[in-house]
Every structure is written in structure tokens, then in C-alpha cells.
Amino acid sequence: MLAQSCCLRLLILLLLFTSICSVPKKSLKYFRNRKLRERRIKLFGTKKTEIQSLLISTWNYTDANLQAWSVLQQGHRRTRQAVIQGCMACQNQRCGLLLAGRSSPDTEGALTLEAAIMDGESLEYGAVAGMDGVRNAILVADAVLKYTKHSVLVGKSATKFARSLGYKEEYLTDARTKNVLKKWSSNGCQPNFWRDVHPSPAENCGPYSPLPEHLHQHPMHQEYAITQGQHDQLAFLALDAEGKFHVASQSSGAQFRIPGRVGDSAVPGAGIYADNEVGGAVASGDGDVLMRHLPAFLAVEAMRAGKDPDQAAEWVVQRLLRHNTEFNGAVVVVNRRGIYAAACAGLDEFNFVVSGGKEYLSMARVERVKCLERENEVIDGGPKGLFPTIPEKQEVP
């Protein structure tokens, strides 16, 4: 009986072993793939707790980016303060002569600033445009968002609003401004933004009068030229570990603009846009083209429709090029998980600075995109770590 019992137990164990070994290979492959998928999900950071903080700024000003990044790292819900700090950091020569404000007058020599900030949670937007006499325009834009039911204030009234809140009025024009304007005037007022007027704006300073419509010629000049260090706008995007976005932009306005012109920094969706449910985007380039097409808004909506950040960035730039073949500029797109991409056109190269997004690359690094007039190279990065173009590491103080 004992021998029979032992044999029975051995038979049962043998059957169990055979059953386990006979599991189809497909099932084993399924379990392996499931583990890979779980690992991939973690890598992409789909869970709220797995989103890594990210600070992106256009162009290659690492100092301003680092100042904004340090604010973002200080604690809970600091995206708003971070983008404001980034904009304020560029009110000096380290962010270029035009962004400093004193080298970007209008045709009458006036220096005016514009700025905007957007909350990705509430979708509230605050902006000022054509504001003179107040240096930190981003603070006034933030005040528009916080203390009014409006979205944009302009001109002298924006300055008056700022003064009513205690912001100091400052005379921004100096000798440098006057020299820049004098040199421009002696060069036949070139470049300028007039067209279809008489005398020819390509050769004369005006005053101008309209040409008859049958004499109109389009285009009379190329799009507004943008080069590294010679641009008038800078944008910041901040994403925290909770998936909260803030975006902001500040500009001194296009150099030698017609007085009264409003730029893309003040127009919702042109230079900045964010929605916590989807992601955010910042754009830089020819502001008048950006205002016509709202690329930052389009990029976010493209992601809402299912496009990845790299697809959204490239699609937006291609759309701009279809209507403006000489367009100069770029767009940087970030989804709600912190995956980012950039595309550009009309420049030799577009640079943007990234802090965070990767635990082992948390400090500011400069990403570079080589741009072609018609063909756009896309940089794709973020938590999944794809970088087709790897720049040389830049030393950060």
C-alpha cells in the first residue's frame, strides 16, 4: 500500500510537471511582452507620479534657464514663478541686445515691451503689449492675469495700469538706442515693414502714401530675419512633477517696427500655449507670421488629436511654410508626460535649452536643430531619451 501511495504521488507530480512544461511558447512570450510594456509605460511616465519636472526656454541662454529651473525645484507648484523668473533674468545683456530692450526701437525711437503668461490648468492668460516705461513687462502681464478679468492690455493704458499697482516707471531709451536709430535712418531706413506705398519703402524713409491697388506687389521683401543673438523674443515652458504647466514669453518687439505694432508674445496661441490635459508649446520667429497661424495653439491641438510631439512640431512648421515660404522660426512642443520635440525652418540652426526631464541630465543643456527651408529636422527627447542630434556638452556655471 505504501509503495502504491508513493507511486501515485510521483504520478501526480509528473503530470503537474508535464502540464507546466507544455505551456505554449506564445503564452511565455505574452508574459515577457507584458513586462516590457510595463517597463515602457514607466519609462514614458504615464503615471502622474512619474512625470519629471522640465524647464525649456527658446534660444541658448543657459543662465536664464538655470535661474528659472532653480525656482521650479524649490517646492510645490512653482511653474508660474519659474517662467516669470526666466523672463526677468533676460532683462539684461546676457540675453542679447534686442531682448535687453534698448536696441529694438520702433521707427520713432520708442522702446516698448510686451509679455504674456498662461496657466495650463485654468487656461487663463495675461498679457501686455506696446507698454513703455516699465522694464519687467512679465510682472505686469502676470498682474493682468491675477487682478483683472481681461487677457491683454496695451499701450499707455498698460503703463498706467502697471503704475497703479506700484511698478516703477523707467525711461528705457539711452544713447545706444539713439545710435541704432541714427544708423538705420542713414541706411535709407532699411529694413522696414512698409509695402505697397509711395515712395518705395525699399529706398526711402517716407512719409508714405498708399499705391493704387492695381500697382500692389506681393511680396516686396522677405520675411523678418531671425538669427541667433538677433531676435527680440524669448519663451519659457515649465512642467512640474504633478503635470502642471505654465508658459511665458517676453519681447522687446521687432526692431524698427511701425509704431503701434503688437507682437506674437501678447497674442494667445502665437508664441505660447498650454493645457494640462494635453501639453504645451512655445514658438519663436517672425512674429507677424506666428500671429497669423497660432503655431503654439495648433501644436497643442495636434497633440489633442493624437499626434506625438515630434509629429505635431513638424506638422506645424510645414503648415507655416505652405503659406510663408520664407518663414524663419521654430516651435518646441511638450506633451503632458514631459516628452518634447522641436522643429524649425529658415535658420541655419535653432537652439533651445532644457533643464530636467531626465534624472541623469537634470541641469541645463543646449539642444540644436539644423534647419532647412523646406525640409525640417526634428529633435525628439524627454523621458524616452531619443536624441537624433546630440550637441556638444555646454559648460554651465
UniProtKB/Swiss-Prot annotation:
One of its GO terms (molecular function) is N4-(beta-N-acetylglucosaminyl)-L-asparaginase activity. Keywords: Disulfide bond, Signal. Disulfide bonds join C90-C95, C189-C205, C344-C371. GO terms for cellular component: lysosome. InterPro entries: Ntn_hydrolases_N (IPR029055), Peptidase_T2 (IPR000246). Residues 1-22 form the signal peptide. It comes from the Eukaryota. Transmembrane segments: none annotated. Belongs to the Ntn-hydrolase family. This is L-asparaginase-like protein GM15681. It comes from Drosophila sechellia (Fruit fly). The lineage of its organism: Eukaryota, Metazoa, Ecdysozoa, Arthropoda, Hexapoda.
